[in-house]
């Protein structure tokens, strides 16, 4: 779809840590996180931790783990590996990372996300657990592939979908690109569950604390723009936009005037422009 810039009255000071952009009043403060730059990391099922900051290949307990310079780690095996506690891939804010699971399924994790997964899947189900946002390209099999979260489970056989489940967000979403998925939602206020079937182009949005499930047609290109290195927002609240940008660049964002968070924007921009340039463009788009 085409994204249009539209004007809104926004007066703000954007604090970048390396300089100031002055507007009439102080409304929004944005500063780099004080945490040092972090790389993605693996925690293996025996507790061993591996920083994914360089190319490597290692044989470990019957597995071959390969990490590339392109930001992707894969798990390969030639024989059955004894079942054990799951592994965890952690992706800090300010970065992204890809993972190839033992069945060939590819997962791309957005900033501030974790995925818990086994070294080798069992014969009854392929189960992983997501916190944050992940883009899944699932290898087809008669064994179901299940992505679990405390508020939403997604069950597939082979398909492509995007799931967003950050613990601090009020909504969990699943957007389907290809195939078919069954989405089961778990209310956080009682023990009720709701299940719906998605076909390509549909998105399930669930508010776990309200128990509200909604299914709508969406622009899947917009919903998965982050996979192409883009920010794409169509009629999205500024508060939500700044939360996403904050995660992507490890920024702390504070709205001194809460009303600004509700202003809706239409913005499309490449992520590699850097946060300073992106913030300038957002200012132009909003006032």
Where are these regions (language model features)?
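A residue-level detector for the "anchor" residue at the start of short, highly conserved motifs
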Residues: 1-8, 18-287
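Active-site-proximal cofactor/substrate-binding loop regions of enzyme domains
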Residues: 11-14
């Amino acid at each position: 779809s085409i994204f249009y810039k539209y004007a809104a009255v926004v007066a703000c000071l954007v604090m970048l840590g390396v300089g100031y952009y002055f507007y009439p009043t102080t409304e929004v403060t944005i500063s780099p996180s004080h945490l040092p730059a972090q790389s993605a990391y693996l925690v293996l099922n025996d507790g061993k931790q591996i920083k994914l900051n360089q190319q490597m290949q290692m044989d470990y307990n019957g597995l071959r783990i390969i990490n590339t310079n392109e930001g992707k780690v894969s798990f390969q095996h030639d024989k059955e590996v004894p079942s054990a506690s799951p592994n965890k891939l952690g992706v800090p804010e300010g970065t992204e990372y890809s993972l190839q699971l033992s069945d060939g399924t590819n997962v791309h994790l957005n900033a501030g996300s974790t995925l818990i997964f086994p070294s080798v899947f069992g014969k009854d189900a392929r189960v992983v657990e997501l916190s944050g946002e992940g883009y899944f390209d699932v290898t087809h099999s008669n064994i179901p592939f299940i992505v679990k979260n405390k508020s939403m489970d997604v069950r597939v056989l082979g398909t492509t979908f995007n799931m967003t489940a950050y613990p601090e967000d009020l909504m969990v979403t699943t957007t389907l690109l290809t195939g078919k998925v069954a989405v089961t939602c778990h209310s956080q206020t009682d023990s009720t569950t709701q299940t719906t079937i998605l076909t390509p182009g549909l998105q399930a949005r669930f508010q776990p604390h309200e128990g509200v499930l909604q299914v709508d047609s969406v622009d899947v290109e917009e919903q998965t723009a982050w996979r192409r290195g883009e920010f794409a927002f169509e009629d999205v609240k500024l508060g939500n936009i700044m939360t996403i940008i904050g995660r992507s660049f490890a920024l702390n964002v504070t709205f001194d005037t809460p009303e600004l968070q509700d202003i809706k924007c239409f913005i499309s921009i490449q992520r590699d422009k850097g946060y300073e340039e992106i913030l300038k463009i957002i200012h132009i788009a909003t006032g």
